[in-house]
């Protein structure tokens, strides 16, 4: 009937609004983006809450992620299945956390997951080495990498255990004025 959307029920849209930083228009825009990634897989009608997983290989081709050296890690951090495949809910969560309105604490939680390559709930020297390799496209020599990693741990490791727990990480990014402006993507 007319221009009334039939992708989601009103209750679904209300629920998305309640648990994200988006309005109804944003949710519909996100669905359109999700649909564009895999039109043969993603239904236009979500009123019966279908569970559809779009593969990471398609998600990382989005313009917002394509050039990001952490694109796979970002997608994995939001993937319920742990393989990087995203449901629509995962996709909305990713955009919600990475939107400008999301609070620093929420962004910090996901940033920590992204940099914790070995998923041991710490950012250790090996995690920092992998981070540096991605940021510098492996252009630093081994001595430079060791120096940078040692310096980061020396300055950010508040409890002296040789690795960064979440509290150490949160304290470190609180001192980074550009964290909020760089840890986001737009719809």
From Swiss-Prot:
Q: Where does Ca(2+) 1 bind?
A: 116, 118, 120, 127
Q: Which UniProt keywords apply?
A: Calcium, Cell membrane, Cell projection, Cytoplasm, Magnesium, Membrane, Metal-binding, Repeat
A GO CC term attached to the entry: sarcolemma
Q: Where does the protein principally reside?
A: cytoplasm
Span of domain EF-hand: 66-101, 103-138, 144-179
Q: Name one GO biological process term.
A: photoreceptor cell maintenance
**Highest rank taxon of the organism:** Eukaryota
**Which parts of the sequence bind Ca(2+) 2?**
157, 159, 161, 163, 168
Fetch the SUPFAM superfamilies from UniProt: EF-hand
Q: Which PROSITE patterns match?
A: EF_HAND_1 (PS00018), EF_HAND_2 (PS50222)
Query: For this protein, what is any one GO molecular function term?
Result: protein-containing complex binding
| Cell compartment(s), UniProt | Cytoplasm; Cell projection, Stereocilium; Photoreceptor inner segment; Cell projection, Cilium, Photoreceptor outer segment
Assembly, per entry:
Monomer. Homodimer. Interacts with WHRN and MYO7A. Interacts with ITGA2B (via C-terminus cytoplasmic tail region); the interactions are stabilized/increased in a calcium and magnesium-dependent manner. Interacts with ITGA7 (via C-terminus cytoplasmic tail region); the interactions are stabilized/increased in a calcium and magnesium-dependent manner. Interacts with TMC1. Interacts with TMC2.
Q: What else is known?
A: The binding of either calcium or magnesium significantly increases the structural stability of the protein in comparison to apo-CIB (calcium- and magnesium-free form).
Function as written in the Swiss-Prot or TrEMBL entry? Calcium- and integrin-binding protein that plays a role in intracellular calcium homeostasis. Acts as an auxiliary subunit of the sensory mechanoelectrical transduction (MET) channel in hair cells. Essential for mechanoelectrical transduction (MET) currents in auditory hair cells and thereby required for hearing. Regulates the function of hair cell mechanotransduction by controlling the distribution of transmembrane channel-like proteins TMC1 and TMC2, and by regulating the function of the MET channels in hair cells.
Question: What is the protein name for this chain?
Answer: Calcium and integrin-binding family member 2
